[in-house]
Amino acid sequence: MAFQLTPLRVALVAGEPSGDLLGASLLGGLHARLPASSRYYGIGGPRMSAVEFDAHWPMEKLAVRGYVEALKHIPEILRIRGELKRQLLAEPPDAFVGIDAPDFNFGLEPALRGAGIPTIHFVCPSIWAWRGGRIKKIVKAVDHMLCLFPFEPELLEKAGVAATFVGHPLADEIPLEPDTHGARIALGLPGGGPVIAVLPGSRRSEIELIGPTFFDAMELMQQREPGVRFVVPAATPALRALLQPLVDAHPSLSVTLTEGRAQVAMTAADAILVKSGTVTLEAALLKKPMVISYKVPWLTGQIMRRQGYLPYVGLPNILAGRFVVPELLQHFATPDALADATLTQLRDDANRRALTDIFTDMHLALRQNTAQRAAEAVARVIDSRKPR
C-alpha cells in the first residue's frame, strides 16, 4: 500500500472498559499492520495504554452510564470533546477511530469528517434494537463502520454506510471449551457443591442499585440449594470495597469475593446471575447458563423502555434472535424471582446442553481474528485517501 514505509498518526477514542478491550485488540492489529513508527493517541483506558497508546485523557472521564446520571457530567465531557476536536483539526491525523461511546464520538466525528479526516467507528450502535434516528447520525459521522456482529453490515450498507464485519475479540480470546476445573482451582474452589457466579456490574451506580437485590437472591438460593457456593468478581479495588459490606451483611453465605478476575469466576461457574452488558456475551462464549438482569433509576428506565423495540436486552438473546436465557429487569428483578430463575438454570441439564450448542455456534460465528480484520479495514480506509 502507498503508506507502507510512511509513519502514520491515528487518533482513537474509547469511553468505557468494553471499548478499552476493543481498542487494545485493534491497536495490536495496527502495530502489526502499519509502520512501526506510527503514533496512536487520544482517549483510552489501561489496556490501550499498555500497547503503546498515548492517552491524553483517561476514559473514566467519559464512562458515565444512564441518561439522567450523565447530566451532571455534561459540562466536563463537552469541554474534553471541544478540546480534542480543536487538537485534531489543528493537527489532522491520518485517521480517527471512535470506539463505541456513540454519544461522545458522534458529536465529534462529523467535524473531523468535514475537514477531510477519515472517520472510522468501531462498534455499530444498536440501530437494530432502538427506535430513533441513530442511522442518520451514523450517515453524517462515519466513513466506515467496523461491526462486531454479522447481521450489521447489511443494515448499514442499505443506508449508504460502508461497513466491515470483523467479529468480536472475546471470541478470539476465549477457548471453545472452557476449563471449569482449572478455574475453580485458581479460585480455591476445587471441590464441594455447585458454583454460581454473581456479577452485579462494573460501576458504582450499578452495584448500588442492584447489588443488594442480588445478595438477597443469593441468600434465598443457598436456602433452596444447600451446598451452593458463590463467587463475586469486583472489577477494581474500589468496587471490592463497595461489595464487602454486602458480603458482611450476609454472613451465612458461602461466597468468594475476587478482584479483577471476572472471566475466571464465570469459567468456574455452573450458572451465572449477571447484570446486562457486554459481560453477558462473555458468559455465552464460556457456554454458561445465565440469568440477565438490571435495575436503573426510574426515569432512565422509562426513557429506555420508550426507545427500545426489541423484546430483549441481553446480547445472547439478541444474537440468537429469541429468548434463550431469561431476563428479569427493573421491578421484575426481585430476590425471589432471581433466585428461582438462576436455580432453574443451574439444575436443568437439558437446557444446559441446548445452550452449549447455541453458544458454540455463536462463538464460531464471532471468531474472526478481529484484531487483524479490523486493522486491515482501517488500513484500507487510510490508503483510499492517500494520493496515488
From Swiss-Prot:
Catalytic activity: a lipid X + a UDP-2-N,3-O-bis[(3R)-3-hydroxyacyl]-alpha-D-glucosamine = a lipid A disaccharide + UDP + H(+)
Sorted UniProt keywords: Glycosyltransferase, Lipid A biosynthesis, Lipid biosynthesis, Lipid metabolism, Transferase
Residue pairs linked by disulfide bridges in the UniProt entry: none
InterPro entries: Glyco_trans_19
Enzyme Commission (EC) number: 2.4.1.182
GO biological process, one term: lipid A biosynthetic process
Pathway involvement of the protein, from the record: Bacterial outer membrane biogenesis; LPS lipid A biosynthesis
A GO CC term assigned to this protein in UniProt: membrane
Root EC class: transferase
Any one GO molecular function term: phospholipid binding
Pfam families given in the database record: LpxB
Role summary: Condensation of UDP-2,3-diacylglucosamine and 2,3-diacylglucosamine-1-phosphate to form lipid A disaccharide, a precursor of lipid A, a phosphorylated glycolipid that anchors the lipopolysaccharide to the outer membrane of the cell.
Annotated family: Belongs to the LpxB family.
Protein name: Lipid-A-disaccharide synthase
Species, as recorded: Burkholderia pseudomallei (strain 1710b)
Taxon lineage: Bacteria, Pseudomonadati, Pseudomonadota, Betaproteobacteria, Burkholderiales
Gene this protein is translated from: lpxB
